Structures are given as C-alpha cells and as structure tokens.
UniProtKB/Swiss-Prot annotation:
The gene is PSBR. It is found in: Plastid, Chloroplast thylakoid membrane. Keywords: Chloroplast, Membrane, Photosynthesis, Photosystem II, Plastid, Thylakoid, Transit peptide. GO terms for cellular component: chloroplast thylakoid membrane; photosystem II oxygen evolving complex. Signal peptide: none annotated. GO terms for biological process: photosynthesis. This is Photosystem II 10 kDa polypeptide, chloroplastic. It comes from Hordeum vulgare. Its main location: plastid.
Amino acid sequence: MSACVMASLALKPSSSPLLQRSKLGGVRPSARPSLVIVAKKAKKVQTAQPYGPGGGVAFKEGVDASGRVAKGKGVYQFADKYGANVDGYSPIYTPEEWSPSGDVYVGGKTGLFLWAVTLAGILLGGALLVYSTSALAS
C-alpha cells in the first residue's frame, strides 16, 4: 500500500538557494571554486655509489645466474640522471657500517642480553596466551 502511495507522488526538484543563478549582472556563478595544484620539485636522493651492476657487484665472468651479460640496467640505470636510482633504493646496511670482521657482534654483551630478554618475553607471552585460552586454565 505504501509503495502505491509513494509511486503516485510526483517528485519535483527542490529550489535550493545554492542552485539559483546569481542576480548580479555580468557575474557568472561558479559551480566549484577554482583550485590550482602546484607540485614542488622533488629532492634528489644522494648516494655515494649506486649498488648493483656497475655499482660494486661483479658477476663471475660478467654473466648473471641466467647466463645473460649484465648491462647495468634496472633501477640503477638512472643513477647519473636523478642522483640515485628510480625508486631511491638505499640499503639498510652499507659497506661503511659493516663490522671489520664478521665474528664479533657489535652490540656487545649488553646487546646480546637485551636480545635474549626480548626473545624470552615473546616466547613466554606466547606460552601464556596458549595456556590462558586452553582447557588447562579453567
């Protein structure tokens, strides 16, 4: 019944004051404000040397694992043009930050202790969650 009543009503557009034309002579109403977007010039990422073919990686006999000759392309081909490669790749650890010998942990005893405490906390927290949701807890 209500569907019949709703269908019989004639719908007309509302006269909103925002949709009415401007009464001033010579002034055109604007449907939207003018918006100008200006992009700033991007900063160039500076790297001491690009990594990859031509940037420190040397393949045995100049051939990669698939048997193709490395041309120094990929993201590293734009190092001279943009100051870095396309995606601004920067490795977390650079050769300047490496330990002189790989057999000494740079964090020392304090770092190892903190690592062990963190690992133990994660394992104990997981065990507590398993225990608290099991039938043994009730």
